Amino acid sequence: MTLQETIIKELGVKPSIDPKEEIRRSIDFLKDYLKKHPFLKTYVLGISGGQDSTLAGRLAQLTMEEMRAETGDDSYQFIAIRLPYGVQADESDAQAALAFIQPDVSLTINIKESTDAMVAAVNANGLAMSDFNKGNAKARMRMIAQYAIAGERKGAVIGTDHAAENITGFFTKHGDGGADILPLFRLNKRQGKQLLAALGADEKLYLKVPTADLEEDKPGLADEVALGVTYNQIDDYLEGKTIDPQSQTIIEGWWNKTAHKRHLPITIFDDFWK
């Protein structure tokens, strides 16, 4: 089995999908988890205004609407959280995403004060936190906030990790990668777009240039620039297609380099890293 075949199998990516079937599959998955864990009453997710959180958020909202209808229990709710660092440049996109998602509850927690306090505390020890490291601190602070809300509201935190992100390890370890449940896992980037289109989303919600936007010295840095490869190339690879050798080398390089992100903390019995 080639490395490409191994990755496709591990991530569960299909070469093509029926968007409506995958929408149903994700909603049923989220519902089944709640039914198995009756002490859980909410799903919590940070909404950035990007494709992935918009899709996961709408799926979560539909899940809770079905749970209420089926059980008569109005405590089943989806909590969407805006988590800006100061003023977000594309706040209008985040508001458009919320308008589409129509969450039961919408909260805002600005992470600037807490993030800056952490940076100052580190710097006070004679270190100088880099802009890149600070960006990761922002992602982790956002997850701290989501778990704080989930803990108060009998909730589980939804993550937005999908196959095109997972293969490259393009997420912050213990940040956006530290969720409880991943309804988009198995989908590549273009398949996520197909689900949003099937859900009736305005195309501006899934055609905007993807960016983590964590680094202040590189505002709005496109994912594809940071990765050195396009999502179309990543998606083609995940669908089993032949892509150019340079792009394949880059993708497989990311897969190998970020293996630690896809594992629990390394123990003496692990050998994947050797």
Swiss-Prot record:
Task: Cite the binding residues for ATP.
Answer: 46-53, 160, 189, 211
Cite the binding residues for deamido-NAD(+): 140, 173, 180, 260-261
Q: What class of enzyme is it?
A: ligase
The biological pathway it contributes to is:
Cofactor biosynthesis; NAD(+) biosynthesis; NAD(+) from deamido-NAD(+) (ammonia route): step 1/1
Q: Write down the species.
A: Streptococcus suis (strain 05ZYH33)
Q: What is this protein called in UniProt?
A: NH(3)-dependent NAD(+) synthetase
Q: Work out whether the entry's keyword set contains Coiled coil.
A: no
The record's listing under SUPFAM superfamilies reads:
Adenine nucleotide alpha hydrolases-like
Q: Which InterPro entries match?
A: NAD/GMP_synthase, NAD_synthase, NH(3)-dep_NAD(+)_synth, Rossmann-like_a/b/a_fold
